[in-house]
A protein has these predicted regions:
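Short terminal hydrophobic/aromatic SLiMs and anchors at protein ends
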Residues: 4, 22, 29-32
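Cationic, low-complexity basic patches in intrinsically disordered or flexible, solvent-exposed regions
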Residues: 8, 21, 34, 42
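Serine residues within intrinsically disordered or low-complexity segments
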Residues: 30, 37, 46-48
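Short, Lys/Arg-enriched N-terminal segments with co-localized hydrophobic residues
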Residues: 44-55
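Nucleotide-activated sugar donor-binding and catalytic core shared by glycosyltransferases
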Residues: 56-285, 294-408
Length: 408
């Protein structure tokens, strides 16, 4: 008995169904007779079937839960689009009019906009989880897929992972094995759940690979594919452009400051001390901060000399960080970009899920300690910074490896 995967039209459109080919069974001697799982005969020309088998597309669904996810999956979307054996369905958990998705984002990344939007909008993590589970389940009712790829550690990511696994669909986690080892963090819970459910654990570095290998279930596989963010940076580096709002900015003469972490923003007394230490240590070196929302409002109210500007496009922000004297951030992605660019970076946290940026790269952790921040900024301004290198597999071929694994 031989099995082939063919496309068969039914009431829901074109779907994939397993058919069984019987050669010399009872009174059936024709090699062109096939039977569906329900026993009905299906006649297909054998040559046509061989072609379908050879060129059968695998449908890969990528779910993005927030703006940073698109930056990571853009090379994967392009890689799948170039492969005749795969088809990509890009889904966004949010709304089509999400203000964080600036009009230029998808053009900057040279990727298509999502074909589907789940329309979820809430500030409650538990509500996001439940809404995404319901919406994604309905989406899969109407759109059969072979594998679902989820990214990072958001509530929407975890929700989609649960729905995928309950449906028996293959699940892949991009940037698996990252840990803070703080179970009180919602994102840490998300990571643990997603990794435990995933069939494919795609890791970025040696440390995350070790964690994934230790924790993986017997039915999952870990692949150290590399850092997908580096694919995006390498693809776009020559396309970075100077921000139009900063025409006179001199390369290497400024510090970039980003702020997003809610806990850090909420403690305004300590944040005020940190901002004061940062600006005093920087001296005449300007600190440029492309901030939005609550972070912008809070820093403005504290009345510092930080130069707050409007949020930048992806290509403009890439130029700003690549040509900075240094970067101060609470973002893991920004610290990775700084290491790639060889730019000194200070992370406002006691830990990082991207340990390679500290052990090999240009990143230093100062926590939320104003005096540690003051000391680190002084070293940054004076040029007294450690030497750094690129971690293993930051070579821009991560998306290529992932597609090869999924289609093997």
């Amino acid at each position: 008995m031989n099995y082939f995967n063919v496309e068969y039209p039914d009431l829901c459109g074109t779907t994939r169904m397993w058919v069984q080919r019987y050669e010399k069974k009872r009174n059936y001697h024709s090699k062109n007779k096939y039977f569906l799982s329900n026993g009905h005969e299906l006649r297909i020309n054998s040559l046509s079937l061989q072609k379908k088998k050879k060129y059968m597309e695998k449908t890969v669904c990528i779910l993005a839960g927030a703006r940073p996810n698109f930056i990571k999956v853009s090379p994967l979307v392009r890689a799948i689009g170039k492969n005749p054996e795969a088809r990509c369905m890009l889904v966004y958990a949010g709304c089509e009019d999400d203000p964080t998705l600036e009009p230029s984002l998808f053009d900057d990344l040279q990727m298509p906009r999502p074909q589907y939007y789940l329309g979820v909008s809430s500030t409650s993590l538990n509500e996001i989880t439940s809404q995404v589970m319901g919406a994604f389940d309905r989406f899969l009712d109407e759109h059969p897929v072979d594998v679902v790829i989820v990214v990072d550690d958001l509530a929407s990511t975890m929700a989609a992972a649960i729905v995928t696994k309950k449906r028996g669909i293959r699940l892949a986690h991009l940037v698996a094995g990252t840990r803070s080892f703080n179970i009180n963090m919602p994102k840490e819970i998300n990571r643990l759940v997603i990794d435990a459910l995933s069939d494919y654990l795609f890791t970025a570095g040696v440390r995350s690979t070790g964690i994934a290998n230790r924790e993986q279930s017997e039915n999952s596989q870990t692949f150290m594919v590399g850092n997908i963010l580096m694919d995006t940076l390498r693809f776009n580096y020559s396309r970075f452009r100077r921000p139009t709002s900063l025409p006179d900015l001199l390369e290497g003469s400024y510090i970039v400051f980003t702020l997003n972490r809610k806990a850090l923003i909420a403690d305004t007394d300590n944040l005020a001390l940190m901002l004061q230490a940062m600006t005093e240590a920087a001296g005449p070196v300007p600190i440029i901060a492309p901030l939005r929302g609550l972070a912008r409002d809070t820093v403005q109210k504290l009345g510092t000399s930080v130069q707050i500007i409007e949020p930048l496009s992806y290509l403009e922000f890439g130029w700003l960080t690549a040509h900075a004297k240094g970067v101060i951030t609470d973002s893991g992605n920004v610290s990775e970009e700084a290491t790639f660019n060889g730019v000194p970076c200070i992370t406002l946290n006691n830990y990082t899920e991207h340990q390679e940026t500290v052990s090999v790269g240009s990143n230093v952790l100062v926590g939320e300690d104003a005096e540690k921040l003051r000391s680190a900024v002084s070293q940054m301004v004076s040029g007294e910074w450690k030497k750094c290198a690129l971690p293993d597999r930051w070579d821009g071929r991560t998306a290529e490896r992932i597609v090869q694994i999924l289609l093997a």
